[in-house]
Design a protein with these regions (language model features):
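Bacterial N-terminal signal peptides that target proteins for export
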Residues: 1-10
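Interaction/scaffold regions that mediate signaling and macromolecular assembly across diverse proteins
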Residues: 26-80, 84-89, 98-274
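Cleavable N-terminal signal peptides
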Residues: 11-12, 22
Length: 274
């Protein structure tokens, strides 16, 4: 009887410690969550968001403090986390440093009227290739986070990340109005996917033609790597017939490879609240 009770107590203690550790790891994103909850606004019937960069600039210290928290995470600490914690961390890092890139250049002498994140690049390099991010023991670029740590690591194989990372442009999937966290990551990624695919200004089926975002052209390979047994872009799309408003006939055509796929122009205008 005593031994049984002791085992129950030990199991309860382990669960409590595990829960506390999980909450502590997710709590690092609290300040980011607070910042974007207050300064990211849903538009376009909830399909998109607009960012009040000017307001965030007024609270720049809060943003930089959060970035310092991310910088303090060591590679060994990161490696010890479960995959959802890692991926939530990397998505938040990408989004927060993108906002930092915009805010630090907003209304500056060099960019008094910033129109697009692409204005922050040059003829020789893009803004995404700039190495300005101290993360996991190295100075990295936004490209490093997305293409090496997330896509290139082989750890995650989840194409839905393309609807979570935000490039500060109108054509991008919405910057989510809350931080990504391990415990909610699956639901958050799923909601972001539906949110983007159901936006008829960026993805729409008419007759035998499916017009979709250029994201699917640039990163098409990511949708052909077996995520949830989908090995083609069409198979991935068929996971979301309701979001895409596909008729039964269109679903059959897509399944049989009979739908024409058209990639829409991308809007690189800054996703700023006006």
């Amino acid at each position: 009887m005593f031994k049984s009770s002791l085992n129950v107590l030990l199991c309860s203690a382990i669960l409590l410690v595990t829960s506390f550790a999980s909450n502590a790891q997710d709590s690092m994103h609290n300040s980011w969550n607070d910042l974007i909850t207050k300064n990211v606004l849903a538009i376009n019937n909830g399909h998109s968001t607009a960012v009040d960069y000017a307001a965030i600039k007024q609270q720049h210290g809060k943003l930089t403090s959060y970035l310092d928290v991310l910088t303090a995470v060591s590679q060994s600490t990161f490696d010890a986390w479960e995959k959802p914690k890692q991926l939530a961390f990397l998505i938040n890092a990408y989004n927060a440093w993108t906002v930092e890139l915009i805010v630090s250049n907003l209304a500056s002498d060099k960019h008094p009227d910033l129109k697009s994140i692409k204005d922050l690049g040059s003829f020789f390099s893009s803004p995404w290739s700039k190495a300005f991010i101290p993360l996991l023991g190295k100075t990295r670029s936004l490209d490093d986070i997305e293409h090496k740590l997330i896509r290139g690591s082989g750890r995650y194989n989840d194409p839905r990340i393309h609807f979570a990372v935000n490039c500060a442009s109108i054509g991008c999937p919405a910057l989510r109005e809350e931080a990504y966290t391990a415990d909610k990551l699956e639901a958050q990624l799923q909601e972001q996917t539906v949110r983007f695919l159901s936006d008829t200004t960026r993805n729409i089926a008419k007759g035998d033609t499916l017009s979709i975002s250029s994201i699917f052209k640039w990163y098409g390979d990511d949708f052909e790597k077996g995520f949830r047994d989908t090995n083609t872009l069409g198979e991935f799309m068929l996971q979301y017939p309701k979001a895409l408003k596909l008729t039964l006939e269109q679903q059959t055509m897509l399944k049989n490879g009979e739908m024409n796929i058209k990639f829409l122009d991308y809007n690189w205008e800054l996703n700023a609240h006006r």
